[in-house]
Amino acid sequence: MRYYYGQLTKPLQGVYDTLLSGFRVYAPSIRIPDVEQGQLAEVYLRLKLDEPLLFYVTGYRCRWMPGAAHLELLPEYLFDKSKIRTHQQAVEARLSRLTRPLQGKPELEQELAIHDFILEQVRYDKLKKPYSHEILGPLTQGVGVCEGIAKTVKALCDRLGLWCIVALSEAAPERGIRYRHTWNVLRIGGQYYHLDATFDNSLQRGVKRYDYCNLDDSRCFRDHESLVFPIPACPDSRAFYYRNVSFTKPEELEKRLAQALRKKQPVFVFHWRGGGLNRQILSELLALAGTLAQARGKQASCSVNVPQAVIQLQFSDAPEPDITIQQANEGEAAPETQTVSE
């Protein structure tokens, strides 16, 4: 689905089409109209966001002829033609194998299956190898960074006919965000939602997390920076994953915690919307959990995603640190400690 293509002017759409045709046949050079370098860079970036199957294109150089009305673009490929074809076959086989069982399923079920594939089968590549920025990393190597993960989500959605785009945000060095970040926007049940599988991947500790599954704009941009390109508005919150375990009062949490402990669940994850998550509130909630856990011979501890107000309670036989503050963007942010206000 060529979402970013539709935001270009007609002349730049022509450049986009020419690049796409050339990349698909591994052309060593592509002749295009002489456009400004900034415009060309934007067209290339939009194309790469729209077309995750172009995993083998890593950049380009340009060559100009004096007085000519065109320029020659020289693509940079990750592999030679033979290796590209081999990797394309592997990617195609993997996409087919992953999506075949999901054909005809409800949109939400398809989305959650894709999300869970990322959490179960892909680990964040802190070395940031070149293929980790493309679908090749998550699909064939089991590693990826945010760009490769978001493109993989889109490739799987495209195969299923599920509306999906890759969202791209700016870096914010002054706040310790060293790199641009990518995630996805999906259309589920006619509504647009944010899905950040990379952040959820970073948060999981013994249980899959869905803190960034189907967020509206207000929640997403609590810890995502401003966008590079416009995306659809996401005002709806009805598909938020933790909607049914979103509490405003301690007594609501107490009832559900008691049920979880009776069922001997080692972990309980919930969303808190009963006011700002400061240390006093966290201590009160942890004390409540601790009292219930002690009645069953357990100790309670918690991990907290402060911006999204999602809390993971752990019940164990041995004492653990009371409160652990989690940072979802650990791969893209400069090392720093997230704090909870008093």
Segments from the language model and where they lie:
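An N-terminal amphipathic alpha-helical segment
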Residues: 1-26, 124-125, 238-273, 332
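Solvent-exposed loop/turn segments at secondary-structure junctions
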Residues: 79, 121-125, 146, 171-175, ...
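Hydrophobic/aromatic-rich core segments of domains that either
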Residues: 148-220
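Metal-dependent nuclease catalytic core centered on acidic motifs
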Residues: 212-300
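Structured segments of extracytoplasmic/periplasmic soluble domains
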Residues: 46, 50, 94-101, 117-121, ...
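Secondary-structure boundary elements
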Residues: 77-138
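Linear, non-domain "peripheral" regions
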Residues: 1-94, 262, 278-342
